[in-house]
Amino acid sequence: MGVTMRDLGKRLGVSAVTISKALSGKSGVSEEMRQRIIRLADELGYVNPNTAQNKDKGMDIGILVPERFFSNDTFYAMFYKQLLQVMAENGHFGLLELINGEMQKSLTLPNLLRSRRVDALILLGQLTEDYARLIAEQGLPTVALDFHCPVIPMDAVVSDSVLGAAEMTRHLIDAGHRDIGFLGNVKATSSIMERYLGFASEMLRNDLPIRPECVLPDRTDDNIVTLPALPKKLPTAFVCNCDVVARPFIEHLRAAGVRVPEDVSIVSYDDFNNAPGSLPLTTYRVDTEAMCRIAVQRVTERSRGDEQPPCRIVVGGQSVLRDSVSPV
């Protein structure tokens, strides 16, 4: 494994960010420290992947995806394909690596970083806070896509989960629903937490109570998808945190003798996986293409020396009204 910025930082007692600034000629590092870093880098044979002569050329961008989110028929597989297309249009090359649970627990760096094969990183999908911090400490231009870690200084591009879930909840209220539940483990990802907040804010705005027994988990805290036990008294509607869990939940309700949408209405989020023959879902469509373009643009700007404070870019979507809601 080659020498990393983190290795240099450990030797000198500074952060990988300081190493990155020193080697790229950025401000924020004393001249004495800059020279110490340069000397140590030369001594250890460190090779900087973001040298000036590469700034106007296409980059090799690593795409790190938690393994549990990725398969050929998932939302993130579609996201990944769109990322590759945007990268190709901009002269960049994308390299995928799946991050399994053991790597996150043991804080094992991805092979793409250990082999120094990439110039920048896009993190697609929620990583643990400790693992995201480890990645950020490596000093490469990095953007989180479809999640964010508030305590880690890192650019993030996310959909407008709060607004989208609020719009879906409002549609149910406008249809006469007053007893509304939520499907999603709010501790599992930042997106689910924000969608719950959007749902809860709209319920509060309309002076409607939320029954705790009707806030159902769709997965474990480790993101293993599960089907929840149903409450004895069902609400008349559910806001589901995403389409991928909404569909099996509908089948779960039907298996219990519940008609959808006649007995229980369903709204969801993402506008993904509307298979022919299945119930057309009322959902909030995420503009994944815009999110990919912004993420690639942001990581490119960072690689070219943008030193603005980390930002969180929120991308809007639109409500798509279909057949999964019945009026009360």
What are these regions (language model features)?
Residues 178-179, 210-213, 260-266:
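Short acidic capping loops at alpha-helix termini that bridge into adjacent secondary structure
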Residues 168-207, 311-326:
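An alpha-beta-alpha
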Residues 87-99, 196, 200-221:
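Short beta-strand elements in bilobed, periplasmic/extracellular small-molecule ligand-binding domains
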Residues 58-170, 228-233, 237:
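Alpha-helical recognition/docking segments in bacterial nutrient-uptake
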Residues 226-328:
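Flexible loop/turn connectors
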Residues 157-182, 220-227, 246, 286-304:
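Hydrophobic alpha-helical segments within soluble ligand-binding/sensing domains
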Residues 1-57:
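N-terminal helix-turn-helix DNA-binding module of bacterial transcription factors
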